[in-house]
């Protein structure tokens, strides 16, 4: 008999740095999952991306087992890394905090394409451009 799906948990965790403290511990603990087992498997799977914020969708089953899917880092995190910034502008319409090239934007769009609802690379690029604009990052 197939396992019954009980819940889906969505978290954003630094790759290779999951630990039982919040937000991971409480989110998994309330569903009765083995927190250390998740942390070990997540850290092993994301070791090569160490430090990047990684969205993860954890599927919890009725027998307290779980599976998880890692996604690509958010476009905002990738844009900040490309522009070598700590954070975006508080007033993106007035203050521009950095800039990225169109080639960098297209590279981010290629990376994000599997996780976006965009049908093609052009639509994904426009989505990343909108994210950059909302963060106060100029496009060269």
Curated annotation (Swiss-Prot):
The keyword Cell wall biogenesis/degradation does not apply. One or more lysine residues are methylated. One of its GO terms (biological process) is translation. Keywords: Methylation, Ribonucleoprotein, Ribosomal protein, RNA-binding, rRNA-binding. InterPro entries: Ribosomal_uL11, Ribosomal_uL11_bac-typ, Ribosomal_uL11_C, Ribosomal_uL11_C_sf, Ribosomal_uL11_N, Ribosomal_uL11_N_sf. One of its GO terms (cellular component) is cytosolic large ribosomal subunit. The keyword Ribonucleoprotein applies. Pfam families: Ribosomal_L11 (PF00298), Ribosomal_L11_N (PF03946). GO terms for molecular function: large ribosomal subunit rRNA binding; structural constituent of ribosome. Part of the ribosomal stalk of the 50S ribosomal subunit. Interacts with L10 and the large rRNA to form the base of the stalk. L10 forms an elongated spine to which L12 dimers bind in a sequential fashion forming a multimeric L10(L12)X complex. Forms part of the ribosomal stalk which helps the ribosome interact with GTP-bound translation factors. Belongs to the universal ribosomal protein uL11 family. This is Large ribosomal subunit protein uL11. It comes from Nitratidesulfovibrio vulgaris (strain DSM 19637 / Miyazaki F). The gene is rplK.
């Amino acid at each position: 008999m197939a396992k019954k799906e009980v819940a889906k948990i969505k978290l954003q965790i630094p790759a290779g740095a999951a630990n039982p403290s919040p937000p991971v511990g409480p989110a998994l603990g309330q569903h009765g999952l083995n927190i250390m087992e998740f942390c070990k498997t997540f850290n092993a799977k994301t070791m090569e991306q160490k430090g990047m914020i990684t969205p993860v969708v954890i599927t919890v089953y009725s027998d307290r087992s779980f599976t998880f899917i890692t996604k690509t880092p958010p476009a905002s995190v990738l844009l900040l890394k490309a522009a070598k910034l700590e954070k975006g502008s508080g007033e993106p319409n007035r203050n521009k905090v950095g800039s990225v090239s169109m080639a960098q934007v297209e590279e981010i769009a290629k990376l994000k394409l599997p996780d976006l609802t965009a049908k093609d690379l052009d639509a994904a690029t426009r989505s990343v451009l909108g994210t950059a604009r909302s963060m106060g990052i100029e496009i060269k």
